[in-house]
């Protein structure tokens, strides 16, 4: 199995009831709850017309929902674009545009200094802390977000579980994510990272740190 997303799918299914991610001194969600949030986010991507290969920018401080947004983007086949939350608004506007991002996840404090008009290709902007829709070209999107649990119920009924997962199957040379440098000399440079690089890191990590398992805790 050389697909990163299929490795994630297998892991989520195998650890469904185990804790997955937490906020520091905050709530913890299981892999099952994480999967629910990811699939619900995939539905919102569909509503926005997002397709595999489209770029999704993520700009906020570290928090559990950052992981949800990143994993949802990756497992949908979209290309996550992490942006440092310390950047000034002009730099964030530039990187969102430079990456041709169609969606933006943003922290509440950062949003106060951003302007959708400066990012004309962006279809929607969501607040990272609660995934509420801050801006959308399609006026129906805010309503869909408010009704996402009902939409999930309509699609899956009461049977949402491990068998409901079917993540996008990536190929080794396919673009996985765009990682921008800190921009010490002028604007940041975007590094295009293929899935084979992620896959190699996963395999090397399991070899180099054999004691790391599904009971280990990792600080990010």
Sequence positions of predicted segments:
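Conserved AMP-binding A3 loop
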Residues: 30-32, 167-168, 176-203
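Conserved structural elements of the adenylate-forming
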Residues: 35-41, 172, 191-213
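A short helix-loop-beta submotif of the ANL/AMP-binding
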Residues: 55, 61-81, 85-89, 97-103, ...
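Short beta-strand elements of ligand-binding domains
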Residues: 60, 83-84, 122-137
